[in-house]
Structures are given as C-alpha cells and as structure tokens.
Amino acid sequence: MTKYYQALLVGLQSNLVYRWNFAVRAGFSLFQLVLVFILWGAAFAGSSRLGGFDFDQTLTYFLVVATLQFFVGAFNEDYQISEEIRNGLINQFLLKPINYFAYRFSIFTAARIVSGSLMLIPLALVVALLHHKLTLPAEAWRFVLGVPALTLSALIQFSIAYCFGLLTFWFLEIQGFVILSMAIESTLGGQIFPLDLMPAGLFHAARFLPFYYQMYFPAAILTGRLDRPTALWEMAVELAWAAILLGVARLLWTRGLRRHTAVGG
C-alpha cells in the first residue's frame, strides 16, 4: 500500500501545478448553474412542479451534481492512460510489482482531492447567494448511504475511463469512443436533466445501466429524490456494476498486455 500512497502524494503535487485549470472548470460550472437557473426557471414558469419536484428542489439537484463532478467525476483519465500506452510508458509497470489499476486510481483520487477542494470556494459563494433557494433533506440516513454511494460512483466512473483508455491496445485513437461515452453519460447520468423526468419505462431501464450510478444516484439520495428502500436496493445494483466493471477492466488489461507483447511493445 505504501507505493500507492506515494503515487497519491505525487498525484497531489502534480495536480496542484494545474490547480488553475481546475479553478477555471469550477468557474465554468458556475456559469452553467446560471444557465440552469434561467432555463429551468422558464420551464417552471407555467407549472409549479415538474416530475413531482418544484424549482428550488431542481436547482438544488443541479448544484449538487455540479459539485459532485469535481469530487467523483472522471475528467481526462482515459486520455492519460491512452497516452501512456501509445508512448510505451506502460512498459515500466510491467517490470515492477505494481498494479496499474491501483496506481492510476491513486492518481485519480489525488486529482479529485485537488479539484474538489478548489470547488469549495465557488460553492461557498453560490450557497451564500442562493441559500434561500436550496432545499436539502435533513434525514441522517441520506448521508450514511450517500458516502458509500459516492465512493462506488467514483470507482464506476474511473473504471469506465480506465476501460476506454485500455482500448488503445487495439485502436490508436480512442477519441470517438470517449466522445460517445461522454454523450451517453451526460444524458443517462442525469447531468443534463434529472432522470426522473424521463418516461417511466425509460427511467426504469436507465436504473439498470451503470451511467445511472455515475452521478444521478448519489445526487438523488442527497437531494431527496429517492426514498430509503429504493436507495438500498439501488445501492446493491451500484455495487454489482462496480464489481462487473472491475472484472471488465481486468479482462481488458490481460488481453491488452497479450496483444502489446505480441507486437513487440
């Protein structure tokens, strides 16, 4: 574990160098919240409630989603992994007793610590300005379930990015795969609109996909869009997806290394 802790420390140092990049992202997220305020304000102009929730609850949901992206979201980990494979940097991990997944997850964790910490500053500003509009439920169980839900969400998001990065073993360019993944994740992950506004059949189907658990599920727990029995059942589904994606990541790594060695990597 010491080597992965060292990787975490190195990741913290390197990400602090790029802290202004994260700060700009945080500032852009504030701009997005302004657009959300305007667009959803117009949507609620003709109705006091949509999908069973009022404007204040919807605004709170989007603020929580924007915040969680900086704490558990994958930014460019897929491209970083792809670059290491293309440049042959992956070879150094084949000669050392280091688990590449654990190493990259340590770097991912470091990046989220830095980005999440920087997000707290604009978040405090937004909360100060919109505190009269924010409606977070006070039930203690939401925090108790929210923490493991966020942990599994981070693992799922990283695992998906990791798998896309490993596709470089077969494809020289993965940008098309990543763009497609981002489009699906934004839609089925609840970043564009709360998923419970979808038709009932589509919403039910989305609950069995991993994208649902990337952002919507933890945000729905924290903002009161799920009751406790539903949250507990979906926590089991989220855990299952985390295990499945870990298995897929392991399979891609094993098969990818065989191909890498076969072509003289």
Residue positions per predicted region:
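Hydrophobic transmembrane alpha-helices and immediately adjacent juxtamembrane helices
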Residues: M1-G265
